[in-house]
Curated annotation (Swiss-Prot):
<dbReference type="InterPro" id="IPR027354">
    <property type="entry name" value="YcgL_dom"/>
</dbReference>
<feature type="domain" description="YcgL">
    <location>
        <begin position="1"/>
        <end position="85"/>
    </location>
</feature>
<dbReference type="Pfam" id="PF05166">
    <property type="entry name" value="YcgL"/>
</dbReference>
<dbReference type="InterPro" id="IPR038068">
    <property type="entry name" value="YcgL-like_sf"/>
</dbReference>
<protein>
    <recommendedName>
        <fullName>YcgL domain-containing protein CGSHiEE_04830</fullName>
    </recommendedName>
</protein>
Length: 88
């Protein structure tokens, strides 16, 4: 499965993974407001041989299937995205 990976200009180290390029329809609008305008980093094959940095491909794949997107945040997060479950 190919996915599109976007980085946040507002939040250093935050990445948003979606199944289809430029399709943010399943991402909550509040999350997108905090994330800022997504900047495409790359298209990535989650079922391929290459690994992602700091995140498991299977976890990303399952989360995208379940909720339509995957949010990767920096380990030193200041709490901006910690309440993702409340945003939904």
């Amino acid at each position: 499965m190919l996915c599109a990976i976007y980085k946040s200009k507002k939040k250093l180290g935050s990445y948003l993974y979606v199944a289809n390029r430029e399709d943010f329809s399943l991402v909550p609008s509040v999350l997108l407001e905090h994330f800022g305008k997504p900047e495409l980093v790359m298209m990535f094959n989650l079922l391929g041989r290459k690994a992602l940095y700091n995140v498991d491909c299977n976890e990303v794949l399952e989360t995208i299937k379940r909720q339509g997107f995957y949010l990767q945040i920096a380990k030193q997060d200041d709490g901006l995205f910690n309440s993702l479950s409340e945003i939904k």
